[in-house]
Amino acid sequence: MRLFLAMLLAAGPAAADTVIAGKSAQALRCAAYIGMAAQYGHAEGLVSDEDRDLMTFWSVLVLERWLPLAPEDRMAAYRRALGELGSRGDTDTLIARHADWCLETFQPAL
């Protein structure tokens, strides 16, 4: 997981013309929802360190399985998706609305 975080921080800019659609786009959004839920929940004391790490790892596995891009482009797309989530209130609403579907639909390969 630390490797993922390092890659996330070091990821360079992806090609701006990359279009992510269909299941890949859904998986990308789901990874962002679960990743942010982990961070928000942990910051508020609602999610343990272990659960935050597990949720973050889930996001990594989903991105690896469902987003067919080079690792640096995948991380750049994830960072863009996180940036597009909007305000905290909007993000909380999206997480509440879609988290269960995301977890059922995108089973990471273990």
Residue ranges of predicted features:
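Sec-dependent N-terminal signal peptides
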Residues: 2-12
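Processing junctions and N-termini across compartments
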Residues: 10, 24-25, 96
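Sec/Tat signal peptide C-region and signal peptidase I cleavage site
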Residues: 12-18
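Compact alpha-helical subdomains of small soluble proteins
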Residues: 50-110
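Short N-proximal segments of mature Sec-exported proteins
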Residues: 19-69
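Residue-level marker of positions within ordered structural domains that often coincide
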Residues: 10, 35-36, 107
